[in-house]
Every structure is written in structure tokens, then in C-alpha cells.
Amino acid sequence: MTNEFLHFEKISRQTWQSLHRKTTPPLTEEELESIKSFNDQISLQDVTDIYLPLAHLIQIYKRTKEDLAFSKGIFLQRESKSQPFIIGVSGSVAVGKSTTSRLLQILLSRTFTDATVELVTTDGFLYPNQTLIEQGILNRKGFPESYDMEALLNFLDRIKNGQDVDIPVYSHEVYDIVPEKKQSVKAADFVIVEGINVFQNPQNDRLYITDFFDFSIYVDAGVDDIESWYLDRFLKMLSLAQNDPDSYYYRFTQMPIGEVESFAHQVWISINLTNLQNYIEPTRNRAEVILHKSKNHEIDEIYLKK
């Protein structure tokens, strides 16, 4: 165990699954298939063993937050205002953050009857490609400077205060922000914020993004495994783009497969791996829970902050 994990409790999958009574997963195999990322692997057994105990833990944190807010209201002699419970989900590109986030959205909406659950990805806070080109940092897309962190902080502040917010929409198919398109995020009981940068700090350091989170999750895996999943995802994106000239990946379908694999590997080394090692992984210990995946995508270890 490294110093990074000294303030975490390491829990095996077997022990973790015993922390919650066995119940039938509140979703079908078809629903699970529809929400998983197309290069990810997850089963109903994973839902039972990992995610139902996780949802129960979130329930504990939510109850604790509400009790504290009530007690503070008594101390301040004023009525406490209801706020959304905000969950941050971080991790590398291609590690399975989106699957985890979408699954949590379903589980929370069905665990808490009548609860509303919004899901937001920080991809929408990337600067448009044209802006990145003008700033000379298109090749740094995904790195901290390519995000409008002030806009992200403003969004979190407004959501925390119960306001509805419209935010930009990013398309992986066109590899850019979609002009004129917005996602309307309503003031909800739960808001899940997913992205590689959700534990990072803006350069001015006046506010910490993690200050807005009531619970936080980091999806982790070995670097070699993540690289394999990234390359697999890249090639699968090509298969989807074969008949779509508007797709960012279409141009790669016209290239020899060897050149494509070489290009994808270079992107991994120069961008995604560098970003992971320098900016994403160093924020891992800011999470309340770390879900570690093995080579076959199965979560084998859980780290819970003490």
C-alpha cells in the first residue's frame, strides 16, 4: 500500500458485496445493456455485488448531509434549504466512468422513490475546437487548460443553489461542441457530474470543484488495461463511422488498419497517458470511494476513505 492510500480502507469484492442484503437488481439485462459504454463490460451480478452496496452507502451519506443541514439550521435559527446531492465521478478516458454514472442514475432514481436524478458530463465544458485552435492548444484537448473551468464552477454553484441551468453539449462523433444545442439541467434531488477533470482545481484556486460534491467516486484500473480498452474503443468507433462522413472518425476508415492502430497508440501515449499520469490520477485520493477494475473490467477492489 502506498502513502496515497493510507487514509483509505481497502475492501475486497467478496467483503463489499456482503455489506448489503441480497436483493434483485432494479433493472433488466436489456436496460443494463442499453446504458453501458460499447467497449465496457458489466453484468447484473456486478450490479448486485458492487453497485447496490454503493447506492446504499450514498443513501447513508445523503441522510448524514440532511441531518447536518437540519442541525445547522437549528444553530443558525433559520430553516435549512433543501439542496441537491451532487456526486462526482472521475477516472481515465475509456475506464468506464459513463457506464458507472448512467447505472447510478438508474439505481438512485429507483432506490429513492420519486427522486429526480440528473446526469451531466464535463465534456460540455470543453472549449469549442475553433477556440482551441485560436489559442494554439488543439493538441492539448482534454488537458486542464482546454476546459472552461470558470463556467463549470458557475454551473455547480447554480445547481447547488437549486437553479435550472442550460449547458453546452459535446459530441464525440463530431469531436466538438454542438453549436446552438443545450442540455437543460433541472434542479434535481441528485446531480451526477462525470468527467476526467471533476476533481481538478481551476488555475485561480479560489474555489475547489470538490467542495461542491457530497460524494465522489474514482474509477481506477491498471494503465496497460486502460490503454487496451482505449485502443479497442477507438477501433470500434471506426466501425460505427464507416458510413457517416460527418463523423470525426470517418477519415480513419479510409486508412490502412496498421496506420490507424499506430495513430491511436500515439494519441494514447502523447495525450491520454500523459493526461492520466500528470493530471487525472493525482486527484484519485480526493474521492470518497475508488472502484478498481481488473483486466476483464470486473471491479475487484474497493477503497473507502476512512
From Swiss-Prot:
Task: Specify the superkingdom.
Answer: Bacteria
Q: What is its main location?
A: cytoplasm
Q: Which UniProt keywords apply?
A: ATP-binding, Coenzyme A biosynthesis, Cytoplasm, Kinase, Nucleotide-binding, Transferase
A Pfam match: PRK
Q: Which Gene3D superfamilies match?
A: P-loop containing nucleotide triphosphate hydrolases (3.40.50.300)
| Pathway(s) where this gene product acts | Cofactor biosynthesis; coenzyme A biosynthesis; CoA from (R)-pantothenate: step 1/5
Cellular component terms (Gene Ontology): cytoplasm
Cellular localization per UniProt: Cytoplasm
InterPro entries, alphabetized: P-loop_NTPase, PanK, PRK/URK
GO annotation terms (biological process) = coenzyme A biosynthetic process
Q: Give GO MF terms, alphabetically.
A: ATP binding; pantothenate kinase activity
**Residues bound to ATP:** G91, S92, V93, A94, V95, G96, K97, S98
Q: What class of enzyme is it?
A: transferase
Q: Which reaction does it catalyse?
A: (R)-pantothenate + ATP = (R)-4'-phosphopantothenate + ADP + H(+)
Q: Does the keyword Kinase apply?
A: yes
Q: Does the keyword Metal-binding apply?
A: no
So what EC number does this one have? Answer: 2.7.1.33
Return the similarity comment: Belongs to the prokaryotic pantothenate kinase family.
**The protein's name in its UniProt record:** Pantothenate kinase
The gene name reads coaA
